[in-house]
Amino acid sequence: MRLNIPTCLTLFRLIIVPFFIIVFYLPFSNASFYSAIIFILAALTDWFDGFLARKLNQTTCFGAFLDPVADKIIVVIGLILIIEYFHSFWITIPSLIMIIREIIISSLREWMAEIGKNNLLSVSLISKLKTSIQMLAIFSLLWKETYIIIIIGILSLYVSSILAFLSMLKYFYIAWRDLFRN
């Protein structure tokens, strides 16, 4: 297998995960800033690898598999770190909604692929919006530099969790007949 640029970017996103976690826990005053920077770098490579794969016509089966895996790993770890840091019901609930949604949708996509209908669950506009706001939420709550940034992060977290739930309902609506046929 030859690695192309988009796949290398996706692999880079996976490679930086341990550094993301380590930097988050470093006992330095600006460790939160650096962990937020690593997270946003991962988010940018997510956008950029998809853009390049389409632009350069370098989509591969391996890349199509690995990209969502890398996305889920960095987002779920970011949410877990935020839950751990804030120790708050108000942060935990929307974060868990998003984590559970990711697991459910990944399972639904896998099942739809098994029955030959994976093309029905293409990424929706609401999911793209959810992802953008989710990235802002995680970045802000990792950085937590000022009260305003934390408020922006919390508001973004709630908006993205609502969008996550709504997009999950949309995916279930699309798959409904297949899920409940005899």
UniProtKB/Swiss-Prot annotation:
The kind of enzyme this is, by top-level EC class, is transferase
Which cellular component appears as one GO term in the record?
A: plasma membrane
List localization entries: Cell inner membrane
Pfam families from the UniProt entry: CDP-OH_P_transf (PF01066)
Q: Which residues cross the membrane?
A: 13-37, 61-81, 87-107, 146-168
Q: A single GO molecular function, which one?
A: CDP-diacylglycerol-glycerol-3-phosphate 3-phosphatidyltransferase activity
Bilayer topology annotation: Multi-pass membrane protein
Cytoplasmic-facing ranges: 1-12, 82-86, 169-181
**What keywords appear on the UniProt entry?**
Cell inner membrane, Cell membrane, Lipid biosynthesis, Lipid metabolism, Membrane, Phospholipid biosynthesis, Phospholipid metabolism, Transferase, Transmembrane, Transmembrane helix
Name a biological process GO annotation. phosphatidylglycerol biosynthetic process
User: Pathway it belongs to?
Assistant: Phospholipid metabolism; phosphatidylglycerol biosynthesis; phosphatidylglycerol from CDP-diacylglycerol: step 1/2
Q: What InterPro entries is this protein classified in? A: CDP-alcohol_PTase-I, CDP-OH_P_trans, CDP-OH_PTrfase_TM_dom, CDP_ALCOHOL_P_TRANSF_CS, PGP_synthase_bac, Phosphatidylglycerol_P_synth
* Reactions accelerated catalytically: a CDP-1,2-diacyl-sn-glycerol + sn-glycerol 3-phosphate = a 1,2-diacyl-sn-glycero-3-phospho-(1'-sn-glycero-3'-phosphate) + CMP + H(+)
Q: Which residues lie on this side of the membrane: Periplasmic?
A: 38-60, 108-145
PROSITE patterns given in the database record: CDP_ALCOHOL_P_TRANSF
For this protein, what is the EC number? 2.7.8.5
Q: Which family does it belong to?
A: Belongs to the CDP-alcohol phosphatidyltransferase class-I family.
Query: What is the documented function of this protein?
Result: Catalyzes the conversion of cytidine diphosphate diacylglycerol (CDP-DG) and glycerol 3-phosphate into phosphatidylglycerol. Essential for the synthesis of anionic phospholipids, thereby playing a role in balancing the ratio of zwitterionic and anionic phospholipids, which is thought to be important for normal membrane function.
The protein's name: CDP-diacylglycerol--glycerol-3-phosphate 3-phosphatidyltransferase
Q: Per the UniProt entry, what species is this protein from, by scientific name?
A: Wigglesworthia glossinidia brevipalpis
